[in-house]
Amino acid sequence: MQQWKRCAVALSAGWMLASSAFAAGEPVRVALIEGMSGPFANAGAAVERNLRFGVEQVNAAGGVKLRDGAHPLELVVLDSKGSPEEALVQLRAAAERHIGFVAQGNSSAVAAALVAALDKLNARNPDSRMLFVNYSADDPALTGARCSFWHSRFDAHAGMRMAALADVMARDRALRKVYLLNQDYSFGHDVSTLARQALAERRPDVTIAGDEFHPIGRIKDFSPYIAKIRASGADAVVTGNWGNDLTLLVKAAREQGLNAKFYTFYGNSLGAPAALGDAGVGRVIAVADWHPNAGGAKSDAFYRAFRTRFPAAQDDYPVRRMSMMIEMLAAAMTRAGSADPVAVARALEGLSFDDGFHASTMRAQDHQLIQPLYVMEMDKAGTPGVRFDNEGSGYGFRTVLAVPAQRTPMPSTCSMTRP
């Protein structure tokens, strides 16, 4: 269905080998190691739907073409419970099942643990290597100071997202005071630091009214935080919160009648528009690699195909980069003629993928995908630019800034060791 261009492209004692040799027709398996239970289970379920959609698209097109013939892809779901420690347990389980490809993204802390483990374990076991594909963990260090040959990121990192948001904040002349509220882990701290830097460079007249972190996944009532924001006099909030930490935050803002804009990384996702309702119209700004109202016949066709496959309103959260990651992984396997993780990692380097509406390239230097970004504003469905709503809420997003792929790259500090 999709097309690609320029396809120039025993973990420790007692651990079993992850084999890359396949019998003809045997599935090539990808292990999704993600929090499928706990406070972010809804985010894990959304990831599974998107990856499964990508797997089904690849298989409908004939699967992965290796030297010995065509093979279907298979998604194997392993529950990390959102914990780095449990993620490493599931990494071992994937190895014991001879799975050479691992997907994860909902936590930069988990991603960092997986990268560190794979760096060591792949070095010790050159015949049982595993490759990590990352769809959402946005800590810039993962393709910077802590980059790895065994890791490729298919999402824009936090710095790239913040740069796009800053373009919109820079022209918001009503902006005077900003409150930074983020989850207390590496990604949340990155968002805070990047927001401070962006505002200092682009809007030095804007005051930081507060800079606060909260425990991730543990706050059930954000009312005290909303009270602090109100007391600070801030007219905008910048947050990288995601999952229930975002939904509960915006719900508290609506209930307390907070009259402030929200500049978010994920304000278009997982219940946030419904939680805000009319209170979010014109006040919630989000940034993403794609959204249903991006426009164009092929973009619309992708969205409608996803909704046909997952028609329930609560499942209406298509994330193009996630299904595209699976399609690019399959393209790299076909290019290499092999499901060997080393060959596939090399084939991914420099791989350009064009589906007709979201052309992207995997930068070889640091394994960071370069793709377009969209900054969007919440409004009622049916208003100009908002043909599709989110999750049956009656609210959707219109593009206020489209950043072409060639404008999104940022310098990298990656110094990669290659096998």
Task: Say what each PLM segment does.
Residues 8-19:
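Bacterial N-terminal signal peptides
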Residues 21-25:
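Boundary at the C-terminal end of the N-terminal hydrophobic targeting segment
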Residues 27, 42-49, 61-144, 154, ...:
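Beta-alpha junction/loop-to-helix N-cap segments that form part of ligand/metal-binding clefts
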Residues 31-54, 79-84, 107, 181-190, ...:
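Extracytoplasmic "Venus flytrap"
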Residues 86-89, 98, 140-141, 148-257, ...:
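Extracellular/periplasmic Venus flytrap/periplasmic-binding protein
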Residues 94-108, 125-135, 179-182, 233-243, ...:
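Periplasmic-binding protein-like
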Residues 148, 250-324, 333-339, 392-418:
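Extracellular/periplasmic periplasmic-binding protein-like sensory domains
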Residues 352, 356-419:
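Solvent-exposed, acidic/polar segments of extracytosolic/periplasmic ligand-binding ectodomains
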